[in-house]
Design a protein with these regions (language model features):
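Short, low-complexity, polar/charged sequence segments that are solvent-exposed and flexible
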Residues: 17-21, 54-57, 116-117, 126-129, ...
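Broad hydrophobic/π-residue packing in well-ordered secondary structure
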Residues: 20-21, 100-102, 146, 189, ...
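Glycine-rich loops and low-complexity Gly/Arg-rich segments
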Residues: 24-26, 59-63, 122-124, 132-134, ...
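C-terminal helix-rich "cap/oligomerization" subdomain common to oxidoreductases
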Residues: 80, 155-210
Length: 210
């Protein structure tokens, strides 16, 4: 996944967006085995070494409506990754490297300065090409996040069941907290036995809609 914003709060939103996609994998969510947060030039080095996928980053960036740099200046299209502009635009890159208990690996790249939206890409078993999407956000000034939240509260009170798994909130908070401990502990890889959280996401889509 990719995101921007440069704060713990924005990182949480990007992590949750990624989690709401990968929790739907076959077998459901199984929990997190380890995390590591790396920053700066080590992020690009990790990509070169294959610790995260350049191809998936390219697919995620292809969904962005807010590429900065030359596109922002004069509207031209550009390949942020292939041209090397991405590395010039992002002064303080951060990578959340997450390993799940079932073997899945996921990476959130916070690339503030390159894009201003949230995007996702993944490799599906048996498929040659990645699949990708952008998470559309409510535009300003009519930001309707609270209205969406209230609608889900109303749905829960009406049906007597939470419309989305509370475990998602718990696991995302745990990932963020553990990654911050990694950051302040020398960017070391940390095992996360406390994040052995298993659950299944609902089959229905819970995307915001008017």
């Amino acid at each position: 996944g990719t995101g921007g914003g440069g704060s713990d709060a924005m990182d949480y939103h990007a992590l949750e967006a990624m989690q709401c996609m990968i929790e739907r994998r076959r077998g459901g969510e199984t929990g997190v085995a380890s995390v590591q947060l790396i920053e700066g030039k080590k992020v690009w080095k990790a990509g070169d070494e294959g610790r995260w996928s350049m191809r998936l980053l390219e697919a995620a960036l292809s969904r962005s409506d807010s590429p900065q740099g030359l596109t922002h200046e004069d509207g031209r299209t550009q390949d942020l990754l292939g041209s090397g502009e991405l590395m010039k635009l992002v002064e303080k890159p951060a990578a959340y490297l997450i390993e799940f208990r079932d073997g899945l690996r996921a990476t959130l790249l916070m690339i503030n300065g390159a894009v201003a939206d949230y995007n996702f890409a993944c490799k599906l078993k048996g498929k040659a090409d990645p699949v990708s999407c952008q998470f559309f956000l409510s535009p300003t000034p009519n930001v309707t996040y609270s209205a969406c939240l209230v609608a889900k509260i109303d749905e829960m009170l009406t049906t007597g069941a939470a419309p989305f798994p509370a475990e998602r909130t718990m696991i995302v908070n745990g990932i963020l907290e553990s990654c911050l401990r990694s950051k302040h502990g020398g960017h070391k890889k940390l095992k996360t036995p406390h994040l052995e959280v298993a659950y299944r996401a609902p089959r229905e889509s819970h995307h915001a809609r008017s």
